[in-house]
C-alpha cells in the first residue's frame, strides 16, 4: 500500500480519537497542487511557441512558467502553516501529558490520591504512543511531499525548505518535546504494558531505545528497519552526559549548570533568568533562554539508568551552588556597605 493511502486511512481513524482536533498535513491537497504544476509543464513542452492563444485559455491553477510562482506560493505557504500548527499542537499535548506523569506541588498530592483508586499508567502510555505516531506520520508526509516537489521541479527547494523548518524550530523530528516523549516512553517501561488495545494498525512509530553506556550516549527512535533518528545526550559544553537538562528555544540541550554558566547567571537563579541578549553557545541565537524547557522525563531516565553518575553530578552541582551563593551574598554585602 502506498503512503498516500496509508495516510488517508490514518486520518480516517483519527476522526473520533484523541487527536481529532489536531492539525494534519493536507497531503492529498498538496499533491494536487504539484500535479497541476506537472500538467502545466507537460503542456509547455508539447507547445513551446505556437500556441500562445491556447495558453491564454488555460486554467489559472496550472503552473505556466519555470519559476512556478503560483505553485510555490500555494505549496510552501500552506506547508509552513500546517507544520507550525502541528508543532504547536504536538508540544502542547506532550506538555499536558508529561505534567500528569511528573506532577509538582499540590497536583502531585492529588495525583497520588487518584492512583489509589485508578491506575492511569496504560492510558497515558497509549496517549504517548498516539502522539508519537501523530508526529511521525506528519513528519513522513512532509518529507515525502518535499521530495516529490524537488522531483517535479528538478530543484533543491524542498531540501532548502527542510533547512528553513529547522531554523524556524518547526522541524517535527528535531523537537525537544519528542525527546521528552521518548524518555517518557522508556520510563514507563511500555514494552511490559498491553499495547494492543486502541492503537493504529498503520502505525509508523516502532520503538525508542537509549544507550548511556557508550562514549557517545544516544537516544534512538526507530521508524522502520531502515529509517532511524539519533538524538545526542551529550552536553555541548561539558562534553559529558546531560544532567538536569534544559532545552533552549532553539532546540539545543544543555546541563542546567552549563546553560547558566553560558548565560552568565548563577545556577540558583535558573536558566530563565538569563538576560535577553544571551546567546545559545551552539547556534548563537539570542532570546532563547526565556522559554527554556526543563527536560524532567529525560533527567528521570538518566537518573534511573546511570544512578552513580547522576548522584556524582548532583553532589558537584550542589557544591557549586553553595559556592556561587556565598559569592553572590558576599558581593551583595559589599555593595550594601559601599565597599
Swiss-Prot record:
Q: Does the keyword Metal-binding apply?
A: yes
Q: Which residues form the SPX domain?
A: 1-163
What is catalysed by this protein? S-ubiquitinyl-[E2 ubiquitin-conjugating enzyme]-L-cysteine + [acceptor protein]-L-lysine = [E2 ubiquitin-conjugating enzyme]-L-cysteine + N(6)-ubiquitinyl-[acceptor protein]-L-lysine
Query: Domain of life, per the record?
Result: Eukaryota
Q: What is its EC number?
A: 2.3.2.27
Pathway where this protein functions? Protein modification; protein ubiquitination
Keyword annotations for this protein, in alphabetical order, are: Metal-binding, Transferase, Ubl conjugation pathway, Zinc, Zinc-finger
Residues in RING-type zinc fingers run 235-284
Top EC group: transferase
Q: Kindly state a single biological-process term from the GO annotations of this entry.
A: protein ubiquitination
Please give the record's comment on domains: The RING-type zinc finger domain mediates binding to an E2 ubiquitin-conjugating enzyme.
Q: Which family does it belong to?
A: Belongs to the RING-type zinc finger family.
What protein is this chain from? Probable E3 ubiquitin-protein ligase BAH1-like 1
What taxonomic lineage is listed for the species of origin? Eukaryota, Viridiplantae, Streptophyta, Embryophyta, Tracheophyta
Amino acid at each position: 500500500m502506498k503512503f498516500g493511502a496509508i495516510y488517508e486511512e490514518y486520518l480516517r481513524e483519527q476522526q473520533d480519537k484523541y487527536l481529532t482536533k489536531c492539525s494534519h498535513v493536507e497531503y492529498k491537497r498538496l499533491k494536487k497542487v504539484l500535479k497541476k504544476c506537472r500538467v502545466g509543464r507537460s503542456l509547455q513542452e508539447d507547445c513551446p511557441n505556437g500556441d500562445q492563444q491556447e495558453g491564454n485559455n488555460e486554467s489559472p491553477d496550472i503552473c505556466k512558467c519555470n519559476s512556478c510562482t503560483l505553485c510555490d506560493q500555494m505549496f510552501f505557504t500552506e506547508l509552513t502553516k500546517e507544520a507550525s500548527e502541528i508543532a504547536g499542537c504536538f508540544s502542547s499535548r506532550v506538555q499536558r501529558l508529561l505534567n500528569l506523569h511528573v506532577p509538582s506541588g499540590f497536583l502531585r498530592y492529588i495525583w497520588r490520591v487518584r492512583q489509589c483508586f485508578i491506575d492511569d499508567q496504560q492510558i497515558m502510555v497509549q496517549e504517548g504512543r498516539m502522539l508519537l505516531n501523530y508526529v511521525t506520520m506528519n513528519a513522513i508526509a512532509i518529507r515525502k511531499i518535499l521530495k516529490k516537489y524537488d522531483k517535479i521541479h528538478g530543484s533543491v527547494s524542498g531540501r532548502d525548505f527542510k533547512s528553513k523548518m529547522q531554523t524556524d524550530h518547526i522541524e517535527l523530528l528535531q523537537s525537544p518535546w519528542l525527546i521528552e516523549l521518548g524518555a517518557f516512553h522508556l520510563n514507563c517501561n511500555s514494552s511490559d504494558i498491553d499495547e494492543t488495545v486502541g492503537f493504529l494498525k498503520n502505525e509508523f512509530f516502532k520503538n525508542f531505545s537509549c544507550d548511556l553506556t557508550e562514549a557517545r550516549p544516544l537516544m534512538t527512535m526507530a521508524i522502520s528497519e531502515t529509517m532511524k533518528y539519533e538524538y545526542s545526550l551529550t552536553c555541548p559544553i561539558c562534553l559529558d552526559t546531560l544532567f538536569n537538562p534544559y532545552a533552549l528555544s532553539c532546540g539545543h540541550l544543555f546541563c542546567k549548570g552549563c546553560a547558566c554558566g553560558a548565560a552568565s547567571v548563577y545556577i540558583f537563579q535558573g536558566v530563565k533568568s538569563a538576560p535577553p541578549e544571551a546567546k545559545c553557545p551552539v547556534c548563537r541565537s539570542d532570546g532563547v533562554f526565556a522559554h527554556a524547557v526543563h527536560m524532567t522525563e529525560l533527567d528521570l531516565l538518566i537518573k534511573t539508568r546511570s544512578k552513580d553518575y547522576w548522584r556524582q553530578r548532583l553532589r558537584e552541582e550542589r557544591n557549586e551552588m553553595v559556592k556561587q551563593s556565598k559569592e553572590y551574598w558576599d558581593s551583595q554585602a559589599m555593595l550594601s556597605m559601599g565597599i
